[in-house]
Regions:
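P-loop NTPase Walker
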Residues: 1-114, 208
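Conserved helicase NTPase motor core
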Residues: 3, 8-19, 23-28, 38, ...
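Short glycine-/polar-rich loops that comprise or flank the Walker A/P-loop
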Residues: 23, 52-56, 81-84, 122, ...
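Alpha-helical scaffold elements adjacent to nucleotide-binding pockets in ATP/GTP-utilizing enzyme cores
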Residues: 42, 69-77, 93-100, 122-126, ...
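A short beta-strand-to-loop transition that corresponds to the Sensor-1 phosphate-sensing loop
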Residues: 43, 61-64, 90-91, 246-250, ...
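ATP-hydrolysis module of ASCE/P-loop NTPase motor domains
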Residues: 82-85, 102-191, 214, 639-643
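Conserved coupling/interface region of RecA-like P-loop/ASCE motor cores
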Residues: 125, 251-252, 389-396, 616-645
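HINT superfamily self-processing domains
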Residues: 252-614
């Protein structure tokens, strides 16, 4: 059997991971390393080469959309349906399991998942029965407490009150709420996975049945798993299982990087220890001391990214390290772009634009205006140039190399109304028969970009796009421009009554987004960024949402951007409290120690004179320990590292 098509277009590291022998495997994916392709091709490899039945494969993603896309790509690669495979989100798979085994799970056959009104009604009855005042015991805060315990896999009997009367009462409410739900034969969203875990844990024959059936368990974004998700996966695979998990690689700075301390002195990052105080940005350019809570180091062999600013400031990091960088009107010089644009239902295309354009109703960066005009879903900056002609030459050559169209997704207005690109039917005839995904992935991998991390996600009125906007240091508790506690903000706009209902089920308070119109907004702040990201993760799974991460480092916020995604002409924030322009990007290959710090509350520090983010795992509410725990649970697991081409 010829299976060369399963490895075609993959680099050596990707091929090794895809064609790895049967056994536990941990794939650490760097920026722009093509991890999604590896998962898709691995499933196809298991079926066509290893002879695995689709019925024996369970694959987990974090959104329904990602699951649907993966299924579609697997079917395209194999040329056959993949319906027998279990592919979905953690909660979606748990729900499916409970529907099949409702009796063993202690549920009625027609059990319901609580909507917002029913959940609030049950909780209010519980509070009334316990003679508790709702103004003191706020339902939505109680629900977040209950959900947090379930995410840890904890029932009321497992939780310690630590001598805290408030916590003791919350545990009592949790117990009464749980009993009320059981009597009513209903479950909330967080209950699905915990109940599915207990179903297997308490029924060894059933667990063995599924262990025998699902010999192949694949997991995407493994670094984002929480406690109950990890427990559920490990229970299913068992010590003899064959898990194939993909997670993000470490994000670190090179040895010798000079970190600005609280007193203004500079010290090499390798000399800093937990408890030291560094200078940090509390938001809006408010630089103050912040405590280092953790230090991290590891050996690194591979490429490092050197970002050079016009002022001479330089920061050297792994390609995966997160910085704050973007295009800001005013500080950003005129720059010309070659971009890759994606529109759902159409595919990918190439185009050119520039920072400053004429005739705008309101000023915005050129590629943002183009994305808005074409109702695009995502956009990546492939390369930047100093002249329009250079960007257009790049567009033509790249289009020919990768077979990507340069035609617009929507008809152009203005001159030549009868021209080719002014007719929607002509444009549909171009894009409909094309499968541009593979070409787009090849291009993005070549330039070190990740298909899951676009430079721009349009804020759209289209209800199919649900952006979860998260702003580090977006607010401050204390009410003064300088001083106070940094608060981190999350906001989500619900464009339909269905979305609104989903958010309300989670206990989120909605308000009208505008005086007129049919949209609603949820917005809140938290001092703990990990807690905020836990909320964001829950919203993402329920709404198939996507993160838009920003840091409010000066008067204008900058996106979270990996070092591999930084482009010339972007601006970053330097220690003088101003924007500075990225002049050039260089790469170097080396074997060295790399380091990172975790900064209390603010999660940023100054490295090489540039404000940068600290380790991504430590702040987003996931359990970085799960990656280390996996290595302990599967000591024979083979490690594969995917790095940028």
């Amino acid at each position: 059997m010829d299976v060369s098509h399963l490895l075609d277009g993959l680099n050596d590291a990707q091929r090794q991971a895809v064609a790895s022998p049967l056994g536990a495997a941990l794939v650490l994916a760097g920026a722009g390393s093509g991890k999604t392709r590896v998962l898709v091709h691995r499933v196809a490899w298991l079926i066509q080469v290893e002879g695995a039945s689709p019925n024996s494969i369970l694959a987990v993603t974090f959104t329904n959309k990602a699951a649907a896309e993966m299924r579609s790509r697997i079917e395209t690669l194999l040329g056959v349906p993949s319906g027998a495979m279990w592919l979905g989100t953690f909660h979606g798979l748990a729900h499916r399991l409970l529907r099949i085994h409702w009796r063993e799970a202690g549920l009625p056959q027609s059990f319901q998942i609580l909507d917002s009104e029913d959940q609030a009604r049950i909780l209010r009855k519980v509070l009334k029965a316990l003679e508790l005042d709702e103004t003191r015991w706020i339902p939505r805060e109680i629900l977040w407490f209950i959900n947090a315990q379930k995410d840890e896999g904890l029932r009321p009997k497992h939780i310690k009150d630590d001598g805290d009367p408030t916590r003791r009462q919350l545990i009592k409410i949790y117990q009464a709420y749980e009993e009320a739900c059981q009597r009513a034969g209903v479950v909330d969203f967080a209950e699905l996975l915990l109940r599915a875990y207990e179903l297997w844990r308490d029924n060894p024959p059933l667990l063995q049945h599924y262990r025998t059936r699902f010999r192949h368990v694949l997991v995407d974004e493994f670094q984002d798993t929480n406690a109950i998700q990890y427990k559920w996966l490990m229970l299913l695979t068992g010590p003899e299982g064959l898990p194939f998990v993909v997670g993000d690689d470490d994000q670190c700075l090179a040895a010798g990087t000079q970190v600005t301390m609280a007193d203004g002195a500079k010290r090499a990052i390798e000399s800093i220890v937990a408890g030291d105080s560094v200078l940090s940005n509390y938001g809006g350019g408010d630089f103050r001391p912040a405590r280092v809570t953790e230090c991290f180091t590891k050996s690194r062999q591979g490429r490092l990214v050197c970002v050079h600013l016009r002022s001479g400031a330089v920061v050297k990091s792994t390609p995966e390290h997160v910085h704050f960088a973007g295009y800001v009107l005013g500080p950003t010089p005129q720059t010309y772009f070659l971009y890759l644009m994606y529109k759902e239902g159409m595919g990918y295309r190439l185009g050119t634009s520039q920072v400053y354009t004429e005739g705008q109703a309101r000023p915005m960066v050129g590629f943002e205006q183009r994305a808005l005009q074409e109702h695009a879903d995502a956009l990546w900056i492939i390369r930047t140039h100093s002249s329009e002609n250079e960007s257009r030459i790049d567009e033509v050559l790249t289009s020919l190399r990768f077979g990507l169209s340069t035609c617009p997704f929507v008809p152009r207005k203005g001159k030549g109304a009868n021209g080719f690109v002014h007719d929607a039917s002509h444009l549909r005839r171009i894009f409909t028969p094309l499968d541009t995904l593979v070409a787009a992935e090849r291009l993005l991998e070549e330039v070190g970009l990740d298909i899951d991390r676009p430079h721009h996600l349009p804020q759209s009125r289209n209800s199919n796009r649900r952006n979860i906007v998260i702003t580090l240091c977006g607010n401050r508790l204390g009410g003064t421009p300088r001083g106070g506690t940094p608060m981190h903000r999350i906001s989500v706009v619900a464009m339909s009554p269905k979305d609104r209902a989903v958010l309300e089920v989670m206990g989120l308070r909605m308000r009208a987004a505008k005086a007129r119109g049919g949209s609603w907004r949820f917005e809140t702040v938290r001092a703990d960024f990990g807690e905020l990201m836990s909320i964001a993760r829950a919203i993402r799974e329920r709404l198939d949402g996507r993160y838009v991460l920003k840091g409010h480092m000066l008067e204008k916020s900058l996106p979270f951007v990996t070092a591999a995604s930084i482009r010339a002409g972007m601006v970053m924030v330097v220690d003088s409290g101003r924007f500075d322009v990225v002049e050039r990007i260089e790469y170097e290959s080396c074997a060295t120690q790399v380091y990172d710090l975790n900064i209390e509350r603010t999660h940023n520090f100054i490295a090489g004179g540039i404000v940068t983010h600290n380790s991504i795992y430590r702040w987003r509410g996931a359990r970085v320990e799960n990656l280390q725990q996996f290595r302990r649970d599967f000591p024979k697991a083979v490690l594969y590292k995917l790095e940028q081409n």
